[in-house]
Amino acid sequence: MVDQPEGTGRIVVGVDGSDSSKQAVRWAVRQAEVTHGGVEAVTAWEFPQFHGALGWLPPSSSDEGALKARALQELTRTVEEAVGPRPAAQVRTEARYGTPAGVLLHAAEGAALLVVGSRGLGGFAGLLLGSVAQHCVQHAPCPVLVVRGEEG
């Protein structure tokens, strides 16, 4: 067996529940099937900003566990909606704390490809990528593919 360079075959896909991210998951799984690679479906979660009479209120440690569990549950549901319970390639899911762009760039280190969705708006606005996709295209440590959602 020939050793493959680090990252060969690992495809990271950003998932936020949108139609375009579901399309990105579908594309990543098809590509992984063809290249005999694996997919790492990643979502980001952050603490909501709580403000009280005395200003910003820090979250409790129980909030952290609940927020991460909810993000992972939503990620798993979205992946299953996109490719079913038994996809054609291995899909690993991970919910990470941080901003979407930051989480995706960190996850993409050593990956063969980063796949993200774009909410393409059509017309002039459609020429612009979403801010997360744009940031990833400009700063990713690997090639990036931006997938548009189905037009409807």
Predicted regions located by residue number:
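Small/aliphatic-rich secondary-structure junction motif
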Residues: 2-58
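General small-molecule cofactor/ligand-binding pocket signal
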Residues: 40-42, 92-96, 145
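Short, hinge-like loop/turn segments at secondary-structure boundaries
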Residues: 56-60, 111-112
